[in-house]
């Protein structure tokens, strides 16, 4: 167990950040699945709407540092390619 005040504070900070990062990561997974489901049904309008929500969430997560910027770009690129394939 931590012996100093600063170590106790670091434990609290880590717990808070871990909880926040888990929530954001979980939300991104859910939104990514919604985009995939919309692409699966070949509904371009629903896919575009889901992509806009997903893209915004990914950008926010990257800005805060929850995910790296390159990973955010990869997520958005893959989703955009999948939507573009819908005829």
Curated annotation (Swiss-Prot):
Record bears the keyword RNA-binding: yes
SUPFAM superfamilies: Ribosomal protein S20
Any one GO MF annotation of this record: small ribosomal subunit rRNA binding
Keywords of the record: Ribonucleoprotein, Ribosomal protein, RNA-binding, rRNA-binding
Region of interest called Disordered, as start-end residue ranges on this chain: 1-26
GO cellular component: small ribosomal subunit
GO biological process: translation
Cell membrane among keywords: no
Residue ranges with Low complexity bias: 13-23
InterPro entries associated with the record: Ribosomal_bS20 (IPR002583), Ribosomal_bS20_sf (IPR036510)
Superkingdom per UniProt: Bacteria
Family that this chain belongs to: Belongs to the bacterial ribosomal protein bS20 family.
Protein function: Binds directly to 16S ribosomal RNA.
Protein name (record): Small ribosomal subunit protein bS20
